Amino acid sequence: MGNFFTSLFSSSKAATPEEEKAKSDQKKFDILKYDGVRAQKMGQVAYAIKCFTEALNLQEDFETMTYLVAAYTVANKAEEALEVLNRMVELEPDHINTRLTRVSVLFMLDKDADVIADCQHVLELEDTNHLAWFLMGKAKRTTADPLGAIADLTKAIALKEDFTDAYLMRAQILLSMAQAAEALPDVEKAIELAPEEETSYLLRGRIHEAMGNLDAAFADYQDTLELNPFNDEAALLTGNLLIAQERLDEAIAFFDEVIDLKPEFAKAYAERGRARNLKGDKEGAFEDLKKSIELNPEGDEAQKLEGQHTNFNDMYKGGIF
């Protein structure tokens, strides 16, 4: 009797099959989404991707797409990340963070020309976004528009005066345009802002060398190596500078130390061989060249020899130099 009156006066109706399915799908979606979040936090990226993908098959959810993009990026699946980001931009074309995330993925895929349109869209929405100016400058640099890049980086710096990366990039571009004197103040500012950044000292060394300030360049290369003894470029620049100054014994001793530290550093053997050759030690030069090619058969030294010699034993020792 009680059940009769309950059903008689109740305003609730039994759920339709469609409503039951929607409720079930929502529950599955929530479980998959948050299982994916937990897996992602635990470093189980493959499982997280599976969870997010299955969740999105049930429901197109913007937040879940964001998680999936992050997981794809960690898994080095940039193409898959870009597909998701493209859909996110379709859903919310004015979402700034999504646009900037897509820019990062486009850089990963070497699609630098496509970056500019996204940056311009962000700047239409928010012209004070220093990161968008910086990224657009970076894209213009790699797409053969150095003047446009400098202009964009200058705007980024005006908006964020402590933007170390922008100073460094502008200095790199100016140096590439043979404007070393103009590049120097930018790299000096970068060092002031981040005194422990090895790449700044390396760049300043290259600028000093371009200006003919060889002692200052040498000091900067040494500072770079003090910050990171394994910086290959700094090691090669230091050795090359010693060779250029005809300080051959010092160059050989320096490369001895480099090779002791990194026995597999093929280019160090080649450069030590060059110094030995200039000193008249053809035998030592040949042995260094041989070791360099053994370590890196696809390197510059091997390419120079291609088609000239088929056997090291028949090769004129030191001839490559």
Regions found by a protein language model. Name each.
Residues 2-21, 286-321:
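Terminal, low-structured helical/coil segments at or just beyond the last alpha-helical repeat
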Residues 26, 59-60, 93, 127, ...:
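Short coil turns that delineate tetratricopeptide repeat
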Residues 29, 62-64, 96-97, 130-131, ...:
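Helix-start (N-cap) detector for alpha-helical repeat units in TPR-like alpha-solenoids
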Residues 24-63, 67-74, 101-110, 138, ...:
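Alpha-helical segment of the N-proximal tetratricopeptide repeat
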Residues 70, 104, 206-210, 222, ...:
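Alpha-helical adaptor scaffolds
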Residues 40, 73, 100, 107, ...:
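Position-specific recognition of the canonical hydrophobic site in helix A of tetratricopeptide repeat
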Residues 43-50, 75-87, 109-121, 142-155, ...:
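Structural signature of tandem alpha-helical TPR/SEL1-like repeats
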Residues 34, 67-68, 101, 135, ...:
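Canonical tetratricopeptide repeat
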